[in-house]
A protein has these predicted regions:
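N-terminal pre-domain/capping segments
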Residues: 1-87, 93, 258-286
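Acidic (Asp/Glu)-rich catalytic clusters
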Residues: 1-2, 22-27, 41-61, 87-96, ...
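Acidic-and-aromatic substrate-binding clefts and catalytic sites of carbohydrate-active enzymes
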Residues: 12-18, 32-45, 69, 107-113, ...
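Acidic/histidine-rich catalytic cores of soluble enzymes
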Residues: 123-218
Length: 286
């Protein structure tokens, strides 16, 4: 869109092969894609589909199911986690992808205090990323105290930045204003919506992480846009969405019933509404 480019995260969760999905995204109007790394996927097909469609590959999402193991004192566990992250970093290098998104934790119980093992393991990842000219974007998820520790540990390192997931902020981080804290280090966005924390006692759980289309949840997008405008300017604002409902929930059901072309068109419509807000000045002009 004029004055603000948009992108969308792509993965196998959409039910069509990722290269085909990328081509559909290109025809819809987005300017960039951000694929999810899979160890056994042929990324060359995805990269070629993006090139043919005139889409930038804005970032690569590193594997996240191994995030907790990066803090483990068990060298076998942490070594396997680091191995996968380094493999995904190799993909970034091979295809000139400038940013790799990394989760710092996965899980809601037994979250450890920041420890030397974690700093050492993430340090190895960051060092290799520096060699490759790839930036590491730590994403806000559960375990926000670990995010804070890593962002402080790598403060001043130009190869480490912040990936802001607007939905995670509401359903995992108790609506803490993370852009006020890390907006000057913002290098990637995962924009999406949800209904906040469902439990009255404030306990967080993964089934609240809906990844709805913007404006289908309770997010205040004027507030979000105002905060993004104060943060480091992004060439692309990226949307990370989901067409599948979480177990025993049905908020995303209607998305899955749509033809994929219609869903992507609606996603682009919502992205343009936010891009328009981003491009406006305070007096409403461009």
């Amino acid at each position: 869109m004029w004055k603000q480019k948009t992108g969308i995260s792509v993965s196998n969760s959409y039910g069509v092969p990722v290269p085909e999905l990328v081509r559909l995204v290109g025809r819809t109007g987005f300017d960039a894609v951000s694929p999810e790394w899979e160890e056994n996927d042929d990324f060359a097909e995805t990269a070629e589909a993006a090139r043919e469609s005139g889409l930038a590959i804005q970032s690569l999402h590193g594997p996240f199911d191994i995030a907790a193991k990066m803090w483990s004192a068990d060298k076998d566990d942490s070594g396997e986690a680091l191995r996968k992250l380094l493999l995904s970093l190799e993909t970034c290098k091979q295809y000139s992808i400038p940013v790799m998104v990394v989760h710092v934790w996965m899980g809601f119980d037994n979250i450890p205090a920041p420890n030397s093992e974690g700093f050492e393991n993430f340090g190895k990842l960051v060092k290799k990323a520096e060699e490759y000219g790839v930036k590491i974007a730590f994403e806000n998820t559960e375990g926000d105290e670990l995010l804070f520790a890593l962002m402080e540990h790598f403060d001043g390192n130009g190869n480490v930045g912040f990936c802001w997931d607007s939905g995670h902020e509401m359903c995992y981080n108790h609506s803490m204003d993370l852009l006020a804290r890390f907006g000057d280090r913002l290098i990637m966005t995962h924009l999406n919506d949800n209904l906040g924390i469902s439990r009255f006692d404030g306990k967080t759980y993964w089934t609240d992480d809906l990844h709805l289309l913007p404006f289908d949840g309770i997010a205040d997008w004027d507030y979000n846009v105002a905060r993004m405008k104060k943060a480091k300017k992004q060439e692309y604002i990226n949307f990370e969405l989901n067409i599948r409902s979480k177990p025993n929930r049905h908020e995303n059901d209607a998305y899955g019933e749509m033809p994929i072309e219609r869903y992507l068109t609606e996603a682009y419509n919502r992205a343009c509404r936010i891009a328009y807000k981003m491009a406006q000045t305070d007096n409403g002009c461009f």
